[in-house]
Amino acid sequence: MTTKTRFAPSPTGFLHVGGARTALYSWLQARANNGEFVLRIEDTDIERSTQAACDAILEGMNWLGLTWDEGPYYQTKRFDRYNEIIAQMLEQGTAYKCYCSRERIDALREAQAANGEAQKYDGCCRDLPARDTDEPFVVRFKNPIGGSVVFDDHVRGRIEFSNDALDDLIIARTDGVPTYNFCVVVDDWDMGITCVVRGEDHINNTPRQINILKALGAPIPEYAHVSMILGDDGAKLSKRHGAVSVMQYRDDGYLPEALLNYLVRLGWSHGDQEVFSLEEMKQLFKLDDINKAPSAFNTEKLVWLNQHYIKTLDPEYVASHLQWHMDDQKIDTSNGPALSAVVTALAERAKTLKELAASSRYFYEDFAEFDAEQAKKHLRGVALEPLQLVQQKLAALTEWTVEAIHQAIEATATELEVGMGKVGMPLRVAVTGAGQSPGLDITLFLIGKARSEQRISKAIEFVADRINS
């Protein structure tokens, strides 16, 4: 039997990291078993579902590279199918119409609460004969009485629920709209889902859904309920812990590989290995290896992984993601070095692509003024001669190569009988406007000969004005 999994988000908000981890685990379960992965949009909550949220979910999945084999399916486009099954269940007696008013249901719950009883429907309409009436009604599933529902969860082991603790679930509201728990069952059945991976908040839905599947004569999928993600303070992860939307991590400068690697380790492990490529995840992933204890989100670990991938992935690939940040920061990369070369030069220093973009601006744009602190420290009178001499030597170069630039800087220090720092620091401030950059030879090479000479001239003029003031 082909393994078939699904990710079924509700489009009432953005794709958050908890949902992304669930999607990843479900995707990996399919890929690890040469199966299929289905994307389903559970939009039956019509009032809260939005197209913007749906678009954001698809954008997040695409950015992460979690491609789907079927879908996206939309529940709101399957109402005819749900109504067909409801009519069939009413005919077979596995569902019934309930005419109880809201007032009666509220009074029942109040009485049960006052008596310390579990709040559940009492089956008032369960065995009533059919009515020919225009009274509003809901449709309820006729849950089995007695016995229990038992299933083996890949994460939590054997779980058992007493049927007597379950009431007769509403499967269609008074307006005819089918409910979440019912739609999920029909979808999983129709789509041939063999394994359901979802959050632990769905555990209580599982016995209800299993009973409906049994009533329909449908196969029961396997289940894996993963634990929640906590903040580093032990509380449930929320906006106050930082970014929770997947695309916010994109905006903050994280690579999808880093986020995927981090998310897979929030509950799953393979020995003490920390770094996993997507291919390695597909080869090694097993649902049974997921820890049932909650995982704490640690931004420092995510940053570490991001640095690792910025440094180790193909610079051309990193540059393709960096371009978004260059555009976002309005840095025109058409007039300057290849972005992949900048990635190679700056990768060791960058924690995020957002930082990398900001620190690469001087390769593409001239700066209006020097950093005040660095200029005060390094563009002083003693810097005039080193700047003038190194400018002459750089101007005389017939080939603008990293090696030739390095030799020109060294020759300047040798000729002036000073340490490299006496030449290098004023030169660095001159061409970058600041005090930090990669090696000066590669920095000058990437900036280009003409632009480097112009900036050195500007620095010489700055120092001269300072001497004369």
Curated annotation (Swiss-Prot):
Functional note: Catalyzes the attachment of glutamate to tRNA(Glu) in a two-step reaction: glutamate is first activated by ATP to form Glu-AMP and then transferred to the acceptor end of tRNA(Glu).
Q: What is this protein called?
A: Glutamate--tRNA ligase
Q: Look up keyword Metal-binding and say if it applies.
A: yes
Cofactor needs: Zn(2+)
- EC annotation from Swiss-Prot or TrEMBL: 6.1.1.17
Disulfide bond entries: none
Q: Name one Pfam family in it.
A: Anticodon_2
Binding locations of Zn(2+): C98, C100, C125, D127
| Span(s) of short sequence motif 'HIGH' region | 9-19
Q: How is the cofactor bound?
A: Binds 1 zinc ion per subunit.
In chain numbering, motif 'KMSKS' region lies across 236-240
Catalytic activity line of the entry: tRNA(Glu) + L-glutamate + ATP = L-glutamyl-tRNA(Glu) + AMP + diphosphate
| Subcellular localization, as worded in the UniProt entry | Cytoplasm
What does the subunit comment say?
Answer: Monomer.
Q: What is its main location?
A: cytoplasm
Answer yes or no on keyword Transport. Answer: no
| Protein's GO biological process | glutamyl-tRNA aminoacylation
Annotated Gene Ontology cellular components are: cytosol
Q: Which UniProt keywords apply?
A: Aminoacyl-tRNA synthetase, ATP-binding, Cytoplasm, Ligase, Metal-binding, Nucleotide-binding, Protein biosynthesis, Zinc
Q: Which organism is it from?
A: Shewanella sp. (strain ANA-3)
The GO terms describing molecular function are: ATP binding; glutamate-tRNA ligase activity; tRNA binding; zinc ion binding
Highest taxon of the lineage:
Bacteria
